[in-house]
Amino acid sequence: MKRRRNKKQGWRWLIAFVILFALASGIPGKASSTTTTSSPSAQTLVAKVNSLVENLSYRSRSSSTSGSSTMVTPSKQKAEAVLTANVKQQLGSSITWNGDGAFIINNNKAKLNAKINNAPYAVDRLDSQGRAWQGDAWLNKTTRQYKNRSETGNGATSWRPVGFMQLTNLKNGPTHAYDRGHLLGYALVGGLSGFNASESNPKNIATQTAWANEARSTDSTGQNYYEGLVRKALDRGKQVRYRVTDIYDGNNLVPSGAHIEAKSKDGSLQFNVFVPNVQNNITINYATGKATATN
């Protein structure tokens, strides 16, 4: 416990140092008015500090919840178990294992139009059976959210999506089975006025395994890994078309996985992947959501 507390304090000091350094770098000295134009504006400086603090804070939080020691990458056999004929038909003919938990779809080329000039938007849709189905968005830096959920009134609630039959005290991987899995991530759309980015939006939340939701390393590519690519692009001022479609097999309550596509307007970012809704230490009855430990 003491070691964990010291680690948290270390992160706080590091974040404080970053803020002080950024502020010091952005304050012009005794230079003429012609040189101050090259100094970062207050707005730009604040944005950079927010980005740095958000990234550092996220790493601190993730060290105890989604570290490499618990985010065990599912095997290819485990991941392929959800690729039924029906699921494959929805994804298309080009489905390739990436070796790190997910599948590359259509040679990683997204079927999205990013050459648009609309204001940022985000829409969430239910399917014909009332299940969380698709989130579609046009994102830029203004849609980013750097504050935590409690600060914006989007904290945890007792609401649960269908099929959310939690299983805890698991071993050899994440200690719990399920998260409230978002389609459009809070950090990506939480700054967009009018969009419900809470954890109780039935159009944007489905039952998702802890691994599929949280895994974020290059050798364990859950949804959070791909969201991280989009976050970084937005922080660099890119405009990104982004779409997440939950893929269901028949009438199942729990999705087989998330089909995630992204494409920036300038073409610097593009991916088309399927993150299977699996976890190495459980088996799932997707029709009901009942999970069984396989320790």
List the predicted regions and their residue ranges.
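Membrane-embedded alpha-helical bundles that constitute the cytochrome b-like, heme-associated redox core
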Residues: 13, 69-85, 157, 221, ...
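N-terminal post-signal-peptidase region of extra-cytosolic proteins
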Residues: 108-109, 114-123, 163
